[in-house]
Amino acid sequence: MQDRLFVSMEHPRALPETDLIKGAIVGAGAVGMAIAYSMLIQNTFDELVLVDIDRRKVEGEVMDLVHGIPFVEPSVVRAGTLADCRGVDVVVITAGARQREGETRLSLVQRNVEIFRGLIGEIMEHCPNAILLVVSNPVDVMTYVAMKLAGLPPSRVIGSGTVLDTARFRYLLAERLRVDPRSLHAYIIGEHGDSEVPVWSRANVAGAFLSEIEPAVGTPDDPAKMFEVFEHVKNAAYEIIERKGATSWAIGLATTQIVRAITRNQNRVLPVSVLMSGLHGIEEVCLAYPAVLNRQGIDRLVKFSLSPGEEEQLQRSARVMRQTLDGIQF
């Protein structure tokens, strides 16, 4: 059964079983600090180091955070450099150029590649045994770039993928159907961006598949107009950026869930960015795809069934990624 359900990843080593779990966040902007806050209140790490090129700012952010430690489980949070991150289990990378209003994620790519050139080498110098979690946009491209620059196996370089998109999808669908989002199972896969793919054929509530109840679900012919839900999901980041300048809180919560799945060895399935190696005929690009996460990093990929239309959309998303990768220098 497992052979038919999963594709195993190569993982030469797992995170060591230790009493203390240590992590680092590189980049103390809005996203990095939302992640740090979420991790602090969920007791994700015993020790957390925040790194940023603006040392005074990150020191101020840490001061603000640690004054709240009496209200949560005790942990150590400090500002530092990458040299202070030796021995960490997970490095979360949020550093990068900020997405401008109206700017697509893909237009960020070359600017962020230049930032990653020096950054990844320094991370590997000081944290060679850590799992890398890339949050910087465009996340699928930057995950691939980080993997190549780091020289690590694909199981140890993970992107935040469409974990947030999937959460938005479930939240908005659940709102329509008047159920708890945790009781609704649906995924968005592919690019974290404009070519992402809603998997309507697998969306279900307690095993009741929406596509069996309404075969036209997610299409313009759907009388319930569920396709509007996906349009809201796809445009959510642009709408938030227009109103407040950046997204932060939800990606902070999403990233914390990914890290907890890894460090707590949860074997949890989340749609993270992973190197595709033959699934659905896709090779040598990183896309968001349901993966089993534990202390190995990405342990296995789920062999996900798609409708013919969804399969074509995923192939198109892969082509978008391939074109972008072919056009950058790293």
UniProtKB/Swiss-Prot annotation:
Outline what the protein does. Catalyzes the conversion of lactate to pyruvate.
**Any one cellular component term from GO for this entry?**
cytoplasm
Which pathway is it part of? Fermentation; pyruvate fermentation to lactate; (S)-lactate from pyruvate: step 1/1
The protein's annotated catalytic reaction(s) are:
(S)-lactate + NAD(+) = pyruvate + NADH + H(+)
**Activity regulation as described:** Allosterically activated by fructose 1,6-bisphosphate (FBP).
- Stated name of the protein: L-lactate dehydrogenase
Sorted alphabetically, which keywords does the UniProt record give?
A: Allosteric enzyme, Cytoplasm, NAD, Oxidoreductase, Phosphoprotein
Q: Which residues carry this modification: Phosphotyrosine?
A: Y238
Instruction: Tell me the lineage of the source organism.
Output: Bacteria, Bacillati, Cyanobacteriota, Cyanophyceae, Gloeobacterales
The compartments listed are:
Cytoplasm
User: Which EC class does it fall in?
Assistant: oxidoreductase
- The active site of this protein is located at H192
Q: How does it assemble?
A: Homotetramer.
Q: Which residues bind beta-D-fructose 1,6-bisphosphate?
A: R170, H185
Gene Ontology annotations of biological process type: glycolytic process; lactate metabolic process; pyruvate metabolic process
Coding gene? ldh
The entry assigns this protein to a family as follows: Belongs to the LDH/MDH superfamily. LDH family.
Q: Which Pfam families match?
A: Ldh_1_C, Ldh_1_N
Q: Does the keyword 4Fe-4S apply?
A: no
Which residues take part in binding substrate? Q99, R105, N137, P138, V139, D140, D165, T166, A167, R168, T247
